[in-house]
Amino acid sequence: MRREYYDDPDAPEPNSLVVATSAVVLDDAGRVLMQRRADSGNWALPGGAMEIGESLAESVVREVREESGYEITVTGLVGTYTDPRHIIAYSNGEVRRQFNVCYTARITGGDMAISAESTEIRFVDRREMDGLPMHDTQRLRLAHFFEQRPEPYLG
């Protein structure tokens, strides 16, 4: 199980620091590729932890492939999300301070496939997002994407 905290005085102290990537991937109708996480039940952009030996761009390409079945090409940067008030606690005792680099990307191949990390994966219309269970940090990344900022968010 996984529990996310944001600006919560009751959040546990982190015992690890993790670099992670995520991507906003659209279909032809402008819907966003999202997964319902098996560990929390929340909806999220596909993404995950960077592995030793890979670049940030390689990390997001691998994570999207593993979690969705799609091959992607990175097309831009939504932003960097490094707020120390965002803590993620796992049932195995890991409590991470995670920072995330969120990209934009387009699909170049593959077929949709659900991984063990998800219970559902699909393209979600923007108007539907408010009704989905989702952590505020995911909503922030999506808001920045939809704002079509001239420069990436650096925070």
Regions found by a protein language model. Give the residues of each.
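Acidic, metal-coordinating catalytic segment for phosphate/diphosphate chemistry
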Residues: 1-22
